[in-house]
C-alpha cells in the first residue's frame, strides 16, 4: 500500500551478480543464529504462514533469530529496508515496483511469495441469499484508503463485473483503518470490504454477511511478498535461502493442518481475538486458496498485479517493471 511519490530515497548501491551459496546450517554447525530484523506491513491473519514459521520454530531450525515489528504501512516498511533498519520485509509487490522506478540507487527485489491474491471480503449489512454484483450500483460502500491495494483490487473486481467504481457506486475511502469496524457498527454504509479476522467476527456477531471474496474474483496476483535490498541479498544469499525454506515449510503446514490448529499457532499474534473468528478466518482463506502453497511467484501473477495498478492510475503503463527485474526466482526454486 505504498504511494510511489512517498518512496524514501537513499541506501547503498549494489553491484555484481548474485551467487547462491550452500544451504544455511548455522545451528547444525553450532554457530549462533543469525539475527533478522523482520518488518511486516500490518498485522493480519492473511499472513498466517509467516506467523506459523515463528511459532512452529521453522525459522529457529533454519538458524535464524527473527525479531518482528509491524510497520503499519508499505511506505514505512520499505523505508525501513532502505534505511537499513530492517533486513527483510513483508510488503505488497507495489513497493518493489515503485522503488524500482524511483531514483533510489538501492532496489528491493522480491524473493519469496506468501499470499496468492487479495484477502478482503465483500460484506453486506443485510443478508442476501443470491448476490449479484449489480446490487452494488447506487449504494454507499465502505472502501479503503485511496490508491491502496485493497481499494485497487476491489475496483478491479467491480470492473470485471460491469461496474464503474467511479460512477456507479459511492466509495467511502476516508475512514481510518482502526475506525472501520466502528464506523460499520454505527450503521454507516450498506456494503463494505473487510479483511480477516474482522470479516469472520462480524459474521459471528450477526453484524455483516459474506458476499464475495475479492481475491477469488480477481484471480492470482501475488498480493504480499518478501523482499530485501539488493545489497542485503547479495551479501547474505544463504540467509535468504534459509528464510525461503522456512516459509515453504510453513506454507505446507498451513495447507495441511486443521483450521483450529492454524488458529492456535497464530493466536499469540492476535491477543484478544475470538478463537472462533481465527479458526473461521483460517478455514475461509484456505478454502478460497488465498494462501500460497509454494514460495514461487509466476510471471502471469505479477503481470496481473501490475494490470491492477495501471487500471487504478497509480502506475504508468510505460513504467511496468519486467518480471526478471522485479523477482529473484532462484531462492523459491531451490526451496525445500
Task: Locate the predicted segments by residue.
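Sec/Tat signal peptide C-region and signal peptidase I cleavage site
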Residues: 24-27
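Aromatic-lined ligand-binding clefts that engage carbohydrates, nucleic acids, or primary amines
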Residues: 19
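Conserved C-terminal helix/tail region of periplasmic/extracytoplasmic solute-binding proteins
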Residues: 306-336
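Pocket-lining segment of extracytoplasmic ligand-binding domains
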Residues: 95, 178-270
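Secondary-structure end/capping motifs
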Residues: 234-316
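Predominant activation on well-ordered alpha-helical scaffold segments within soluble catalytic domains
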Residues: 51, 97, 155, 200, ...
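Short, glycine-/small- and polar/acidic-enriched structural segments
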Residues: 29-166, 170-174, 180-183, 190-196, ...
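N-terminal secretory signal peptides and thylakoid transit peptides that target proteins
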Residues: 1-15
Amino acid at each position: 500500500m505504498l504511494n510511489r511519490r512517498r518512496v524514501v530515497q537513499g541506501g547503498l548501491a549494489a553491484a555484481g551478480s548474485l551467487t547462491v551459496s550452500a544451504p544455511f546450517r548455522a545451528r547444525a554447525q553450532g554457530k549462533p543464529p543469525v539475527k533478522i530484523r523482520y518488518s511486516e506491513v500490518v498485522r493480519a491473519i492473511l499472513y498466517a504462514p509467516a506467523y506459523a514459521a515463528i511459532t512452529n520454530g521453522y525459522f529457529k531450525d533454519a538458524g535464524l533469530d527473527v525479531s518482528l515489528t509491524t510497520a503499519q504501512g508499505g511506505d514505512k516498511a520499505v523505508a525501513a529496508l532502505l534505511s537499513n533498519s530492517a533486513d527483510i520485509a513483508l510488503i505488497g509487490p507495489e513497493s518493489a515496483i515503485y522503488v524500482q522506478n524511483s531514483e533510489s540507487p538501492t532496489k528491493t527485489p522480491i524473493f519469496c511469495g506468501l499470499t496468492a491474491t487479495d484477502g478482503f471480503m465483500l460484506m453486506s449489512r443485510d443478508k442476501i441469499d443470491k448476490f449479484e454484483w449489480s446490487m452494488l450500483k447506487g449504494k454507499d460502500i465502505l472502501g479503503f484508503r485511496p490508491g491502496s491495494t485493497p481499494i485497487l483490487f476491489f475496483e478491479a473486481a467491480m470492473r470485471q463485473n460491469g461496474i464503474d467504481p467511479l460512477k456507479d457506486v459511492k466509495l467511502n475511502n476516508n475512514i481510518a483503518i482502526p475506525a472501520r469496524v466502528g464506523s460499520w457498527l454505527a450503521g454507516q454504509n450498506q456494503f463494505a470490504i473487510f479483511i480477516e479476522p474482522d470479516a469472520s467476527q462480524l459474521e459471528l456477531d450477526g453484524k455483516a454477511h459474506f458476499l464475495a471474496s475479492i481475491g477469488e474474483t480477481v484471480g492470482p496476483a501475488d498480493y504480499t511478498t518478501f523482499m530485501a535490498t539488493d545489497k542485503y541479498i547479495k551479501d547474505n544469499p544463504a540467509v535468504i535461502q534459509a528464510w525461503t525454506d522456512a516459509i515453504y515449510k510453513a506454507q505446507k503446514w498451513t495447507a495441511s493442518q486443521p483450521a483450529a490448529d492454524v488458529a492456535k499457532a497464530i493466536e499469540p499474534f492476535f491477543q484478544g481475538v475470538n478463537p472462533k473468528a481465527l479458526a473461521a478466518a483460517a478455514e475461509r482463506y484456505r478454502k478460497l486458496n488465498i494462501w500460497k502453497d509454494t514460495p514461487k511467484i509466476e510471471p502471469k501473477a505479477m503481470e496481473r498485479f501490475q494490470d491492477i495498478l495501471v487500471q487504478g492510475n497509480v502506475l504508468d503503463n510505460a513504467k511496468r517493471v519486467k518480471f526478471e527485474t522485479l523477482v529473484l526466482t532462484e531462492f523459491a526454486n531451490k526451496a525445500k
